Amino acid sequence: MNTNIGIIDYGMGNLHSVQQSFKRLDQSIRIVKSPNDVHECNALILPGVGSFDPAMENLRRTDLIPKIKSWVKDGKPLLGICLGLQLIFESSEEGNSEGLGLLKGKVCNLPRNTKERIPHMGWSLLKQIKECPLLDNENTSRWMYFVHSYSAIPSPEDLAATVSFGDSEVTAIVWKDSLGACQFHPEKSGKSGQRLLSSWLKWLHEKNSDLS
């Protein structure tokens, strides 16, 4: 079975950079703007740059929210990136809108009792908490590029990796079943980001082979 990946276009995502990253991995990405665009896909990407409430409002306008919820409920793969990670939770301190509620938990301000600047911007090293398809088993450094002012507080069993912020560890990757998300930008994280996307792609190919 071919791997057909769709990236959700709701006006607040860095689509071109993500597409280029997958192009370097010889994987094409199709644009998803409406529920009808999802039919040919067997994996989805939810990117995001900006603020929580406008993002949820834009998603509502696409009529994709029910489709995204049923997609994840059916165990189909979805990858959230940056703001996309925050949107899959129930709520955010940044706004008043309900999130997608695909994972239990909420999004909170980054810790203020630190000398670290907010937004957290730049390269940081991941600390793996549990195995997940986004992280390969190679013993290599995982420096990723972050730009964010808020951090998700997931259920402990859904936390896959953290990153240091001052004296705190904040969420970097979450994973549950076939739903995963990263707070950083893999498409802007050089070889480390490419390796992460390649790991996800390999997992997708294996998953699709099992279904064919």
UniProtKB/Swiss-Prot annotation:
Biochemical pathway: Amino-acid biosynthesis; L-histidine biosynthesis; L-histidine from 5-phospho-alpha-D-ribose 1-diphosphate: step 5/9
Domain of life: Bacteria
Gene3D superfamilies per record: 3.40.50.880
CDD domains (UniProt xref): GATase1_IGP_Synthase
A GO biological process held by the record: L-histidine biosynthetic process
Main location as per UniProt: cytoplasm
EC number: 4.3.2.10, 3.5.1.2
Reactions performed catalytically: 5-[(5-phospho-1-deoxy-D-ribulos-1-ylimino)methylamino]-1-(5-phospho-beta-D-ribosyl)imidazole-4-carboxamide + L-glutamine = D-erythro-1-(imidazol-4-yl)glycerol 3-phosphate + 5-amino-1-(5-phospho-beta-D-ribosyl)imidazole-4-carboxamide + L-glutamate + H(+); L-glutamine + H2O = L-glutamate + NH4(+)
GO MF annotation terms: glutaminase activity; imidazoleglycerol-phosphate synthase activity; lyase activity
Signal peptide annotation: none
The keyword Transcription is assigned to this record: no
UniProt entry tagged with the keyword Cell inner membrane: no
Domain Glutamine amidotransferase type-1: 4-210
PROSITE patterns: GATASE_TYPE_1
Function: IGPS catalyzes the conversion of PRFAR and glutamine to IGP, AICAR and glutamate. The HisH subunit catalyzes the hydrolysis of glutamine to glutamate and ammonia as part of the synthesis of IGP and AICAR. The resulting ammonia molecule is channeled to the active site of HisF.
Name the record gives this protein: Imidazole glycerol phosphate synthase subunit HisH
Species: Prochlorococcus marinus (strain MIT 9211)
Gene designation per UniProt: hisH
